[in-house]
Amino acid sequence: MKTNRMTRLSLIMSLFLMFITISSASFAQGWRAQEMEIKINIHSTDELIRLHNLKLNCDEIYTIPGATWAYVTPEELHKLNQSGLSYTVSIPDLNKRTLNTDGTLVPNGYMTCQQVDSFADSLANAYPNLVKRVYVGTSVQNRDMVTIKLSDNPGEDEAEPEIWFQCGIHGDEIGPTENGVRLARELCKKYGSDSLMTRLLNQRETYICLMVNPDGRNAMSRYNNDGIDINRDGGYMWNGEGNSPAPYTAIESKALRNFINSRHFAVCTDYHSGTIYLSFPWSYRAAQAPDFTHIESLGNVYADASGYSALPVGQGYSGMYPINGSTKDQNYGSNGSVAWSLEISELKQPPASQITYYYNQNKNGMLQLMNKAGLGIRGTVTDTAGNSIPARLRIENTMPFFNDPIKADFQKYLVPGIYKLYVEANGYESKIISDIVVDANNATYLDIKLTPDQSNAWAGKIVTSYIPNNNFSDEGATWAAIGKADNKNYSIGKYGYVIVDAIDTIINLPGSDFKVYEGDNTPEEYSVAVSTTIDGPWHTLGDATGTASFDLDGSSLNKVRYIKISDIGPGSSMAPDAGFDLDAVELLHIKARAAFASNKQTICAGDNVNFSSLSVGNPSTFEWQFEGGTPSTSNEANPQNIKFNQSGTYNVSLTVSNGFGSDQLQRESYITSLELPVVDLGNDTVVDYSQSVPLDAGAGAASYLWSTMDTTQTQLINSTILGLQGGDVWVKVTGMNGCINSDTINIHFMNWDGIGSGPEQHVIVNAYKNTNSLNISWAGQQLKQLKVYNIQGQLLELIPMNGTSNDEVKLKTKQKQIAIILVIESNERPIGHKLIW
């Protein structure tokens, strides 16, 4: 709503006044200069609100009356004095604590940063089939944010529920890291002997970040080495707390965000110490999160399984202390994961003798969390051919969540009930699945297939949002701003902004490239900037009022992924629908994305396969590669009759382009060409009509079918079966893999009665196939002529003989087999026959 107007200069000045600029040199010892720890007493909700408005670095508080510990400089203490809140100083100067003999501040009995790092290496080396070190990022001082993956196939990305545990985001809260170490070690040691732990490693992918803030642990400081509270630096509803001058200022925050955004975690747990409480979203506002019922249910699973007599479970804002920029709000608000922070001990640094005690208090809770996180709904989102599609999903009245863009799988924890699921993906028709039944003991699996729709493309995720000083008069429905325009909107706040992830790449083509929709009937002013990365640099496209289209020509960029929409006033800052009301961002030109299908993937050697492109983004060129195929390449959109003659497994790739940029999809071992059974009945033959011919179709087949209708491996063929003249005999053999091969032989029966069984001993016939000739020698008789027959008994040649003792005969005809009959001159009595070549 519009009530007044503020110039852009005033906006910039007000933002600068909010930010606290701190040099990293001030944090050489882990804390700001002269920073002290104080205990603040809170007696009422009014005092809690006054404390929150001071934006001090405070630990959580979950009872009123109660107390919290804050970390303040002398300047901040002066502001606290003016507020009228009561406090006592517990540590006058946090930078003057005594170092250990090894030069660190980590209490004896707890692992140092180097020891944590070495532990991860040692565990991965000892259990390479269960553990893999994964890279999340490094700290300001170049320490690794030590992270391990636990799974029965740690080197593979499997379609299994993913669990995220993070420890030590506040470096001086050291117990959680010890818990993570012990959980990882016990899972490995008991794999194969403990049924639950074995199943969790077989059916889950569990990631444990043992040190989010290694510099802070090394210095026993809440902050990173630049003095930023990483748990106030998150981008979802960031508000300038924790010395954070802008969202994701800390290098550790960026690394954490990028890694978590690259996965699709079902549950994200952020471990702390300093009290005992399981705190779930929202922490930035009092209103319940859309998934409140589901998150609370899973939180109670942890609490009930834990060793605590009564682990409190509740919303962060009301159950503990209001904060902005927390990782739990970020992981839930942007990614839709069940997310919370979990405080495991009253003391931040309990005596080392209690490390095992607190691990045992949490172990069963962690195991049951991993176990139950697989309930609700699971499944995949693909196109009709099974190609993975990056999709956004939303159960009605809950936060959107996302599938794995590579493996296509998703997981959403839900309490038992009947649900409706909305599924959207750029370049595909949207789908609504109703009446999904979820029970208490098993996940409901959904195999979701979407049909291409080139015109359907919308921005899909809110990655950063900022409403100055919050605005609890508005519902803060960030989820309303993603997906298709539907007149439901997120009001970004007066002088607030939002960064939208298009999920796809928007490309610069002639005309407008994307369109911003306002969701109400009161057009308001805003500015738009774009970037190829989530952190900028940002290129301004200009200002607009209400729904408007934008062209990337104004940015000097050919492609972008992120869009920053900033309200530029006027209007009230603390009213319903304050600021620009963002309904949706439509993507008018998206980068081509390759996808394809075939009419079959498993074939028998020699079969043909037909391929078709299912690519989105209106591609104009196609480049196919068919390993082992004939032909091996094609530039058609839908190549047909690609033959795979040899058995084996073959890759297929498709590269598409729509004029700007290209995309390739290679599917490994996409075509499986099965071996044909070996069948060889031998050469065609001529035999006497009284003889039988044994035939063998080869051992080891699944079935046989002969032309005689017999189904055995062997046959004995004679003139009674085939007839006096003979003929073809065929067999079809089906291999164990289902492939069929066949062979045919011609058997000719001749009546040699009166001709003899062969040439007499004194007649010798030598055949020379390469010259198609015969050498005939004899003694004692004069030969008159040579008759040449084929196997069907037809006379091919009649060759006069010279009657001498030997002769060289050149045949005119070539046949596979020729029956030769020699005739004696005196009475033309046949003296024998011989079958040659």
Where are these regions (language model features)?
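Short, acidic Ser/Thr/Gly-rich low-complexity loop/linker segments typical of extracellular
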Residues: I389-V415
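Proline- and Ser/Thr-rich low-complexity, intrinsically disordered segments
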Residues: K591-N618, T630-N638, K643-N645, T649-N766
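A short, amphipathic beta-strand motif
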Residues: G376-T384, I448, L695
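C-terminal outer-membrane/trafficking sorting elements
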Residues: L9, I22-A28, T621-E623, T649, ...
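A domain-level signal for the mature, folded cores of soluble proteins
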Residues: T104, N108, K132, Q454-I590
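A short, solvent-exposed beta-strand micro-motif common in secreted/extracellular proteins
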Residues: P416-G427
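Structured interaction patches on ligand/partner-binding surfaces of diverse proteins
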Residues: G427-D453, F749
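Active-site/substrate-binding loop(s) of hydrolase catalytic cores
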Residues: D157-F292, E296-N300, D304, Y308, ...
